[in-house]
Amino acid sequence: MKNDFFNYYKTKIIPQYLKDYNKKKALEVPVIKKIVISRGIGKANTLEINNYIEESIKEFLIMTGQKPKLNRAKKHIAAFKIKKKMILGLSVTLRGAKMYAFLYKFINIILPNIRQFQGIENKQFDSLGNITFPIYSQSNIPELPYNPRVEKRGFNVTINIKAKNVSEAKALCAYLGFPII
């Protein structure tokens, strides 16, 4: 899947972008640098937190093919009841082959499965052109088995785009097949 989507990017998107925007070099075309998938532990009960973390690690492994990094607290914050080295969340950074495989799956399978998803809004882009999608339930992922007894656990998908400005990042997203409002 990576080779197909990567080859599609190289053979179709880059030449079309160069033609449409009067660019001369392929290096002037915006490119996706990485995809970060993260989940906060949040309201997990302290008695069930180990089980919650283990299930989250398994879900991330199935979803991305990579073991997630555990994000820990750097210091103690009494007001939030956070202890030093307490696990606050999980994250996976995808690059290369796994990034393109996940991007293909995200655009063509996951986004169409989300109820009431109409497209990317302007507020989802930051000032550098990166996009963040909140996915509110793991039931949108086809690889993960549906279990009605398990609470909905969402995650965030951040796509890091190297572009000169936001309009170039939006153009790349449109060429890739993201629905833009």
Curated annotation (Swiss-Prot):
Pfam families per UniProt: Ribosomal_L5, Ribosomal_L5_C
The keyword Ribosomal protein belongs to this UniProt entry's keyword annotation: yes
UniProt cross-references to Gene3D superfamilies, sorted A to Z: 3.30.1440.10
GO MF annotation list: rRNA binding; structural constituent of ribosome
Recorded family membership: Belongs to the universal ribosomal protein uL5 family.
UniProt protein name: Large ribosomal subunit protein uL5c
Source species, domain of life: Eukaryota
TM region positions: none
Gene Ontology BP, a term: translation
HAMAP family xref list: Ribosomal_uL5_B
Subunit-structure text: Part of the 50S ribosomal subunit; contacts the 5S rRNA.
PANTHER family: 60S RIBOSOMAL PROTEIN L11-RELATED (PTHR11994)
Compartments, record wording: Plastid
Presence of keyword Transmembrane helix: no
Organism: Helicosporidium sp. subsp. Simulium jonesii (Green alga)
Matches recorded under SUPFAM superfamilies: RL5-like
Any Gene Ontology CC annotation: plastid
Keywords, sorted A to Z: Plastid, Ribonucleoprotein, Ribosomal protein, RNA-binding, rRNA-binding
Protein purpose: Binds 5S rRNA, forms part of the central protuberance of the 50S subunit.
